[in-house]
Amino acid sequence: MDAATLYQQLFSAAHRLFALEGEGVIRELAVEAWVGREAISALFEWRIVAVSANADIALDSLMGQRTTLLTTLAGGGQSRRTGLIRQAEKLGADGSLARYRLTVIPWLWLTTQQHHSQVFQNRTLDSIIEAVLQDYAPYAHWRYAAGAEARIAAFGERDHIAQFRETDYQFLSRLLAEAGLGYTVAEDDEAPFGHAVVFFADSAQLPEDPESAAGGGIRYHRAHSQESADAIQQLICETRAAVGGVAVSAWDPEAKRAIRGHAPARYGVFSGRAVSPDPYFSVSLSLAPDTTSAQRVAEQVMEAIEVRALVFTGSGSVRTLRSGTRLTVTDCPHLPPQPDDTAGYPLLLDAVEHCG
């Protein structure tokens, strides 16, 4: 048996937990290990170490290629993570095998590579997003989650907004933050490069993790080869001091008046534990030209404070976890009680670090 045949048998996707899918020489690579990090409103990055019997793969041929990291699940299905190869490195050779390291990123990373200075007048947020991202065709593919377009409509037109020596990514991140929008990256079979950017206004509209949805939640349980499903092994709850409300004010020099907004804490568990007076923020008139806009800004700031008042950190063996998805944790005795004792505890995955 020659080395190539032995390699194909040992590193066949049928015998491996992880595999790479792609065109050309990507098919010759077998995953040895990988790590990655992803988060809401941030660019993910996977670093994949792969081996191949071909020690002469041209690294330039891998740049910009679409690749999908396949993960075999406990039930026999597969989880997909798709991106573009940003960097390819040859780490050396060991006997008849060569090692390569691939860095995989979403298409939105391309927006970090260009700086522009331009002005938009009397434009809605979605039209500005389209104007900025259309330069990244054919890679660019995005959509809006339920409720995002209504938030954009409520935000209205911007009379004047400037991008000055910013990357397109910095500019878009600033606009989304002002409008109270976030984004996440999701798999999309209709996208030309297998993944899409999803803009959202309400995290409750984001999809549930497939393992959590199929099993009625994910158990807080041990990790063992005899278990039939993945589980969460550690979960730590961290609480922070909250405030009872937020006040916002903008000064209109022509009308000689202050435009104000105030948002109280929405959740009693936080408002009852407030330990300081309501914080006061002075904002630009362009951000709060009227009372409605000032109220919207106050509510967004209050949401940002409340979302950080109760944070969970944990670890587990659940192979489907992605940032920007929701899950329900069951059988965890130290989580806050729910009105329904049989219901699990709902969580939103903000950031996920992977190792495989």
Locations of regions flagged by a protein language model:
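Amphipathic alpha-helical and helix-coil boundary elements used as assembly
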Residues: M1-G356
